[in-house]
């Protein structure tokens, strides 16, 4: 059986890690052992933050909807309850966009929510 020298494979593996570490500061960008740890940690942060991003955006949308709903005389929870009773199925992302960029449309939705609560 022939002897296998792994120089080519090792070089490719090192190059892959160092390419992923491009743009890092200090030894993290050009020392394989340090770069490998930095890339692994970056992967962990990326994995965690892909999940966190969803939570953070939902919280942002809720804060924006709450602010706009209070301008219309409703709290967030009462506004959302009114939407549910009025059978208006608009998600929080769209409501937040309306609250920021189209206040008259949001005000109309808020009026419908208020009307459904009075019944």
UniProtKB/Swiss-Prot annotation:
* Cysteine pairings via disulfide bonds: none
Q: Which GO terms describe its cellular component?
A: ribonucleoprotein complex; ribosome
Which GO molecular function terms does the record list?
rRNA binding; structural constituent of ribosome
Looking up CDD domains in the UniProt record yields: Ribosomal_L20 (cd07026)
Q: Which GO terms describe its biological process?
A: ribosomal large subunit assembly; translation
Is Ribosomal protein one of the keywords UniProt gives this record?
A: yes
Q: Which Pfam families match?
A: Ribosomal_L20
* Record's keyword terms, sorted: Ribonucleoprotein, Ribosomal protein, RNA-binding, rRNA-binding
Q: What's the stated role of this polypeptide?
A: Binds directly to 23S ribosomal RNA and is necessary for the in vitro assembly process of the 50S ribosomal subunit. It is not involved in the protein synthesizing functions of that subunit.
Q: Which PANTHER family match?
A: 39S RIBOSOMAL PROTEIN L20
Protein family according to the UniProt entry: Belongs to the bacterial ribosomal protein bL20 family.
Protein name (Swiss-Prot/TrEMBL): Large ribosomal subunit protein bL20
Species: Nitrosospira multiformis (strain ATCC 25196 / NCIMB 11849 / C 71)
